[in-house]
Amino acid sequence: MLEQVQKFLLSRAACEGSDSHTRYAELFHKLDVNKDGKVDILELQEGLKAMGMAVGKGAEEKIVEAGDTNKDGHLDFGEFMRYLEEHEKKMKIAFTSLDKNKDGKIESSEVMNSLKTLGINISLDHAEKILKSMDSDGTLTVDWNEWRDHFLFNPADNIQQIIRFWKHSTVLDIGDSLTIPDEFTEEEKKTGQWWKHLLAGGMAGAVSRTGTAPLDRLKVMMQVHGTKGNSNIITGLKQMVKEGGVRSLWRGNGVNVIKIAPETAMKFWAYEQYKKLFTSESGKLGTAERFIAGSLAGATAQTSIYPMEVLKTRLAVGKTGQYSGMFDCAKKIMQKEGILAFYKGYIPNILGIIPYAGIDLAIYETLKNYWLQNYAKDSANPGVLVLLGCGTVSSTCGQLASYPLALIRTRMQAQASIEGAPQLNMGGLFRKIVAKEGFFGLYTGIAPNFLKVLPAVSISYVVYEKMKIQLGI
C-alpha cells in the first residue's frame, strides 16, 4: 500500500491546478473510510497507519485543528484540499531554505550545515541516515517530490520545526545527576522552549525520585552500614518501617527533590559557557569536546549544590527524631562539625563524574549508531522504546563504573554521624572496605539501585511527555 501511495504521490511531480486537485481527491478518497465525505481524526490515524506514513505524536489532531475552518471536528474535501495546498507552500519554503546551492536537491552537506546554524552538529553518517528516511530512489539526495511526500502529513510548517522532528532528546532521571546536559538549538533558546523542556524534566525528576525514594534510601543505608541488618531488599525495607514507620521510607527525599532546580539551572548555564570555550573556529563541537564540557558542567553544578547532597545522606541515615527537618539538620552539622562538613566526600564525587558521564555518553552513542546502521530501513527515527532502552543501558553502565566512588562518597558524608566511627579519608575508606568486605564490598547497595532504574525511567518519561503537552512544547 505504501509503495502504491508513494508512486501515486510522486507521479506528475510538477503538476499544478486540476492535477493537484485530482491527487488530493484520490488521497481523500483513501482516507474517507466510511465514505461520508468527511475525514475525522480516527480516520486519519487509521488511514495513515495503513499507508505506512509515520507522523509525530498528536499530528492527526493538529492537522484537523489547522484545516477545520468551520470547527465541526471533521475535514471535508474543500478543507482537506486547502490544508494540503497551504501546507505544501510552507514545505516548499522550508525545502528552498535548505537547498543552498539551488540545484533542486538536498544533499548531506546541506543537512549538516542547516542543523549547524541551529546549534546542532551531526556526523556525515547521521546526515545520510536522515536523507535515507526520505529518499525513495536511492540517490542519497532528496528532491522536492520526496521532501513533500515525507512531510505531507507532518504538521511541522517551518525548518525549525522540521529540525526538531529529526532531533531526539529524552529526559531520563534515575536519581543520579552526573549525565551530560541536553543540547538545545539556538531557535529553542531564543523562543524560550529550552526552559519549558527543563521545567518538564524537573517535574519528571521530582515525581520519579519520589516514586523510587524507598529504594534510594535503602541503597544509602546499605552503603553506609554495609549489609548488616539489611541482608536483602525486603529485610532492609522492613527494618526501616520498623524503626520509623512507613513515612521513614521517604526520609531525605525532600532535599533530593528540592536540589533538582538549582542543579539543573547551574548545569545548563555552565554547559553553555564551557561549550563556547571548547568550540573550534569552524563552530564545530566534537564528541570529545562535548564530553569535556559536559563533565565540567556537571562538576560545576555538583560543587554548587553539594551541601544538599550531604544533607540528603545525613537525613537518610538519621534515626527517627534525630532531625526535625532539612534546616535543623544543617544547623546541627554546622554547630558540631563546622562548614567543611558540608563538603565531605566531595573529591570521590567529582572523580565519579568522569567514568559515569564518559561511559554513559560513549555507550549511548554506540547503541544509537548501531541501530541507525543496522535497523534504520525506512526512518532515521529510532522511536521511543529504542531511545529509552539505549538511555537505560548507558546510564546503568555508567553507574556500574562509578559506583565504588559513589559508595565511598556516601560513607564519607555519613561517617561523622555514626558514633565511634573513625574519620577516614578516601584512600583509607577504600582499603578498609576491601580488607573487611572484599572487592564486592565496593558494590554494596547496588541491587536496590539497579532495581529502581526501570521504574524511575518509566515514571520520568511518562511525566515528561505529559508536562510537554501541558507546556505546549
UniProtKB/Swiss-Prot annotation:
Ca(2+) 4 binds at residues 135, 137, 139, 141, 146. It is a multi-pass membrane protein. Residues 216-251, 309-344, 406-444 are mitochondrial matrix. Ca(2+) 1 binds at residues 32, 34, 36, 38, 43. Residues 19-54, 55-88, 86-121, 122-157 form the EF-hand domain. Ca(2+) 3 binds at residues 99, 101, 103, 105, 110. Solcar repeats lie at residues 192-277, 285-370, 382-470. Its main location: mitochondrion. Residues 174-473 are annotated as: C-terminal transmembrane transporter domain. SUPFAM superfamilies: EF-hand (SSF47473), Mitochondrial carrier (SSF103506). Ca(2+) 2 binds at residues 68, 70, 72, 74, 79. One of its GO terms (molecular function) is ADP:phosphate antiporter activity. Activated by an increase in cytosolic calcium levels that induce a conformational change of the N-terminal regulatory domain, uncapping the channel and allowing transport. Inhibited by bathophenanthroline, mersalyl, p-hydroxymercuribenzoate, bromcresol purple and tannic acid. The chain crosses the membrane at residues 198-215, 252-271, 295-308, 345-364, 388-405, 445-464. One of its GO terms (cellular component) is mitochondrial inner membrane. The regulatory N-terminal domain/NTD formed of two pairs of fused calcium-binding EF-hands, binds calcium in the mitochondrial intermembrane space and regulates the antiporter activity of the transmembrane domain/TMD. In absence of calcium, the apo form of the N-terminal domain is intrinsically disordered and binds to the transmembrane domain, inhibiting the transporter activity. Binding of calcium leads to a major conformational change and abolishes the interaction with the transmembrane domain and the inhibition of the transporter activity. The C-terminal mitochondrial carrier domain/transmembrane domain/TMD bears the transmembrane transporter activity. This is Mitochondrial adenyl nucleotide antiporter SLC25A24-A. The gene is slc25a24-a.
